[in-house]
Amino acid sequence: MQRRTMIMNYRMVSQSAVALALFVVSASAFAAENPHAAMMLKCAGVCADCQVTCDSCFHHCASLVGEGKKEHAKCMHLCVDCAECCKLCATLCARQSDFSAIAADCCAKCCDDCAAACEKIADDKQMAACAKSCRDMAKMMK
């Protein structure tokens, strides 16, 4: 039952990321005329990519925790928090919300923490990819 719920949640997250990506693509014509809008849309796209990477790493860590590898639990929690922050930031940036700067600060902090946790577990390609995505995201937000 727990695996079924996890799969359903993963599908919902993937669908929301696809919807956001389509929104970003459709808004590109407007962005071509407005440099600020172009930057906001670029940020939204990078946020959406990081969200997908963090959600994937969350799933990876959840599987490992299920196998008894408890050292992945903290990373698992940080990945899901980071994915949510990235999702919020992507949405607000795509809308060019006045609150996007606040979301970007929160996103940078979450990404830094997530990257640090993923980097602690060596020799795991999934976690290395998540750490890189988060580091790149945090750098862009600062």
Annotate each PLM feature:
Residues 2-14, 23-142:
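Intrinsically disordered, low-complexity terminal tails/loops enriched in metal-binding residues
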